């Protein structure tokens, strides 16, 4: 899935289209190939997305691969070997970010605890790493690929055809399922003159009234359109990748849950949640105490009249109000002249 040398933007788009189709169709067995493509893309263009966005996406793909082996009841030796392969002990990828390092360590701890004391049911694990987890991952990938499309030159059908002929002689871009799906989700359009008689790769689609009234998914692509076959991650535009959506359970959770092991005993589950990373500027005590999240005005209003006000005048003996007023009034002021009359 890595781009072939010397082909250029078209090869990147083919690799991106293949990765996008793999994630959209939930082909977990091919997730490692998607990780390889993202790592090669990161090495070539590190400025497409931030470091945390890239690492969150790669960690999610790797975690799903390991979890899928557990759900398939593979031998624990195979699961632990996959864990060691995808999350090596001496990994420098997460040392730049404490949250990512914590998420990585806690996930490895979870898998090791499960191998030592397998639970009687994997329903909770399947739910945590189920469709909601995949939808959140799909959003991260979509935003990543949108940034890639912004960095690449405009799409040209002939360049795509040349790249496809280089890798698969005799094939045509109009028959590429991955490229067609990717083009629809990215909103590709081709002028009539650029197709050289091969026909438009992406035909314009009329939007239904429901699609016209629905808010558009925020995308860096100015011309991106959502067709009737849009991915599941684009059906909820209010949850944007990289903002506040839940990418559980790759980071620390606030709630405590337990696994029921096969030995009929309870064991604390070392779950973690990756998002949200930041506490929106609130102190740690504000997050744990709901009362402390009240409006600042309410707290200040309640404190009026209850806290002593320390001033320098409070240290001096009390004086009559009239005398003190005369002392504080400048001699040449109008108020002073009226008092002397």
From Swiss-Prot:
Signal peptide feature range: none
An annotated GO cellular component: nucleoplasm
Name of protein: TERF1-interacting nuclear factor 2
Sequence motif Nuclear localization signal, location on chain: 249-255
A GO molecular-function descriptor: telomeric DNA binding
Record PTM N-acetylalanine, positions in chain: 2
InterPro entries, alphabetized: TINF2, TINF2_N
Ranges spanned by the short sequence motif TBM, renumbered to the chain: 243-265
Source organism (scientific name): Mus musculus (Mouse)
């Amino acid at each position: 899935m890595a781009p072939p040398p010397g082909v250029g933007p078209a090869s990147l788009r083919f690799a991106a289209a293949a990765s996008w189709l793999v994630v959209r169709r939930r082909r977990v067995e091919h997730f490692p190939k998607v990780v390889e493509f993202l790592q090669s893309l990161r090495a070539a263009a590190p400025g497409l997305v931030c470091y945390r966005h890239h690492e969150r996406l790669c960690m999610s793909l790797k975690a799903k691969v390991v979890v899928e082996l557990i759900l398939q009841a593979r031998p624990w030796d195979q699961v632990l070997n996959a864990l060691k392969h995808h999350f090596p002990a001496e990994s420098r990828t997460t040392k730049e970010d404490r949250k990512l390092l914590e998420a990585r360590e806690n996930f490895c701890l979870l898998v090791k605890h499960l191998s030592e004391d397998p639970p009687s049911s994997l329903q909770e694990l399947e739910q945590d790493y189920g469709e909601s987890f995949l939808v959140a991952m799909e959003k991260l990938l979509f935003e990543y690929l949108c940034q890639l499309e912004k960095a690449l030159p405009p799409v040209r059908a002939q360049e795509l055809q040349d790249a496809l002929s280089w890798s698969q002689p005799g094939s045509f871009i109009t028959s590429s399922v991955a490229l067609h799906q990717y083009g629809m989700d990215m909103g590709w359009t081709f002028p009539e003159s650029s197709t050289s008689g091969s026909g438009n790769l992406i035909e314009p689609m009329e939007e239904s009234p429901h699609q016209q009234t629905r808010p558009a998914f925020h995308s860096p692509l100015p011309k991106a359109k959502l067709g009737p076959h849009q991915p599941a991650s684009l059906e909820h535009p209010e949850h944007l990748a990289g903002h506040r959506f839940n990418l559980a359970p790759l980071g620390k959770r606030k709630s405590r849950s337990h696994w029921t092991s096969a030995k009929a005993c309870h064991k604390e589950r070392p779950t973690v949640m990756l998002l949200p990373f930041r506490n929106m500027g609130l102190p740690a005590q504000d997050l744990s105490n709901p009362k402390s999240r009240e409006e600042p005005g309410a707290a200040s209003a309640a404190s009026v009249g209850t806290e002593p006000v320390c001033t320098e005048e409070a240290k001096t003996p009390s004086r009559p109000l009239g005398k003190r007023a005369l002392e504080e009034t400048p001699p040449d002021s109008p108020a002073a002249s009226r008092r002397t009359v």
